[in-house]
Amino acid sequence: MTPEVARRMNRLNESFYRDNARSFDQTRQTAWPGWERCLCIGHTTGALPRYGGVRVLDVASGNLRLARYLAERLPGVRVSYHGIDSCPMLARGVRLPEGWDVTLQDLDVVGTLLDKKLEEDLGAPGGDLGVPLEGGAADLVACFGFFHHVPTTEARRRLLQELLSYTRTGGLCCVSLWRPMSDRRIAKRARESTRAGLRSLGLSEKELDKGDYLLGWQGRLDTWRYCHHFDEEEIDWLVRAAQGTAELTARFCADGKAGDLNSYLVLTRS
């Protein structure tokens, strides 16, 4: 995928969430089963205390449903929560516990990654997203339902490194990687919508990378979003990319009717 097409895919997604924020929010209200397993791992390893204080960085926080889930599951914990998203309207009206220290940052993460990668030689990761975390690195860095919106393998690698750079030593970095082609119904729809999307946008299939798709929304053919399917080979590659910075604590599939719609990586910062 060329830099120009990658930027276009990001603009496509930015427009999609801006134009469909209300209807999208209505379909994203419940927690995912995979989150519970991540939380259990955090308790078991001691990375997440059941009492006291914990710092959380939520990248692609959307309508704050992860924050709401944590509020229910960690009632005795003082949480310092920093959420990042480029569609702030999704979080409007959401109330979190009064005892929490909450900051929300409006940031186009994908655009930042693409611009940095294409225009600068960044060298080693070290917080290039410019996240102003209070009190240092986070105990839990979570990025759920977002990696599949990041075009190019290199940008996805950089995102994982960025997430780890904001994770404290011994803390957890938890990410989900979408696997839509594991569901026959979703896979069929993805292939059909991609063909329609390419025609609508005047693009050819060769301009996308392996595993890239264009999805519509609620039967409409005038709005598109870029998505990527993660196969086992690419997930293996991401795990290797984290070596030297973090240890793989868990890797599992969860979510969806068959329990395999997302692949999760739980990484402990070295």
Where are these regions (language model features)?
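Class I (Rossmann-like) S-adenosyl-L-methionine-dependent methyltransferase catalytic domain
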Residues: 1-54, 63-131, 174-270
